[in-house]
From Swiss-Prot:
InterPro entries: YspA. This is UPF0398 protein llmg_0513. PANTHER family: UPF0398 PROTEIN SPR0331, UPF0398 PROTEIN YPSA. It holds the Pfam family YpsA. Belongs to the UPF0398 family. The lineage of its organism: Bacteria, Bacillati, Bacillota, Bacilli, Lactobacillales. HAMAP family: UPF0398. It comes from the Bacteria.
Length: 174
């Protein structure tokens, strides 16, 4: 696989409001293991959409892995205005999404709901698969994108769920 889209729950969805929460280290350890597998299979591009939570933690892991693996990181934001109203701490995280190998904005500003459909279609057409932290038992707005991914032909979907995190937690405590 050449390009992998990374999406998942936000920190708000997960009830994580502190980066020092043990859940963050479990999630990042799981991300690292999965990303290394993708990279060793030849992954060339990791693509983000600029969301906080799972995506941001995956971005941090990906940037660390760039020291040992040769691959590119890109962020394709839905709008140029994405994150402009975030607090100072989250602005720093937003800046991190912009300090990657490739940055693009799908639209200048929000005008209508159809832009989200076009944006999602663009992401699916320009990546070969996705790594998504999503559990069908804990639905969020991600549900619709995951359904689109699964319906796309020749598109690989790798779901990370709470069971995977439990396995990582147990390994950490062995």
């Amino acid at each position: 696989m050449n390009s992998l889209l990374i999406m998942g729950y936000t920190s708000f969805d997960l009830g994580i409001f502190n980066e020092k929460d043990i859940k963050v280290s479990i999630i990042k350890k799981t991300i690292k293991r999965k990303l290394i597998n993708f990279l060793e299979e030849g992954l060339r591009w990791v693509i983000f959409t600029g969301n906080l939570g799972f995506e941001y933690w995956a971005l941090e892991v990906a940037k660390e892995l760039q020291t040992d693996y040769e691959f590119q990181i890109g962020t394709i934001f839905p709008f140029e205005t994405h994150g402009q109203n975030w607090n100072e701490n989250n602005q720093i995280k937003l800046a991190s999404f912009k300090q990657v190998d490739f940055v693009k904005y799908a639209f200048e500003a929000y005008e209508n709901p159809g832009q989200f459909r076009q944006y999602n279609e663009f992401l699916l057409e320009n990546t070969e698969g996705s790594f998504v932290f999503y559990d069908e038992e804990n639905e969020t707005k991600l549900k619709y994108m995951v359904e689109k991914m699964k319906q796309s032909s020749n598109y690989e979907v790798y779901l990370l769920n709470f069971e995977d995190l439990q396995e990582t937690f147990e390994e950490m405590n062995d």
